[in-house]
Amino acid sequence: MALQSRGEHAALAEIRDSLLETYACNDAMNQLILSELDPRAWRAPLPGEKRGGRTIAAIFAHLHNCRLSWLKNSAPHLKCPAALDPDRCTMKQAAAAHRKSGAQCLRMLTDALSAAPNRLVAKFARGSWAQTWPAGATMFAYMFSHEAHHRGQILLLAHQMGYRLLHTTPGVWHWEKLWKQAGLATRPH
C-alpha cells in the first residue's frame, strides 16, 4: 500500500468526518418527524391499502429493528437496545429507541470508517438474506439511504392521510439547524 501524503490523509479524514456528521444528523431528522407527527397518524389505516402494508408506527419500528440487525451482525461488541414491536410501540418509545440505536450505529460507523488497523468493525452484515460487505463508506451509504427512503415513505403517508408534516419549517432540509441540534461544532461541508 502506498504511503499517503498529509494532504491526502487530511482529505480522507474530512470525508470520514463528513460521513459521521451526516449520520449523526440522520437521527435528528427522525426525531424531528416524530416530534411534529400528529399522534392520530401513528397507527392510521393506510390510504387505499387492502392487503396490509406498514403504518407509520411500523415503519419507525422497522428502521430501529434494522439498525439492531446491523449492530448485532456487524458490531456484536456494542450493546443493542430492545427491539420495537411494530404493533404496540408508542411514539415516545420509538423516539427513545431511535436515539439509542442511532447512537450505537454512529459508534459502529466511527469504528468502521477508522483507519486504525485494530478496528473492531471490519464487515457490514445486513442479515442472512444479504451478502456481507467490507465495512466502510458503502456501509454508511446503505444505512443512510435505507433510512432516507423510509423517511420519504413516512412523509408521503402522513401527507396522503391528511397529516401534513414540516409545512411551516424547512425541517429535514435545514441541515445547518440539524447539525447544531446534533451538537456538532462544524457545519455541513
For the regions a protein language model found, what residue spans apply to each?
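Short, contiguous alpha-helical
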Residues: 2-5, 20-31, 40-86, 125-189
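Short, contiguous pre-domain boundary segments
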Residues: 3-15
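Active-site rim elements
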Residues: 13-20, 91-95, 140-144
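Juxtamembrane/interfacial segments around transmembrane helices
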Residues: 107-117, 186-189
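Acidic catalytic patch
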Residues: 111-129
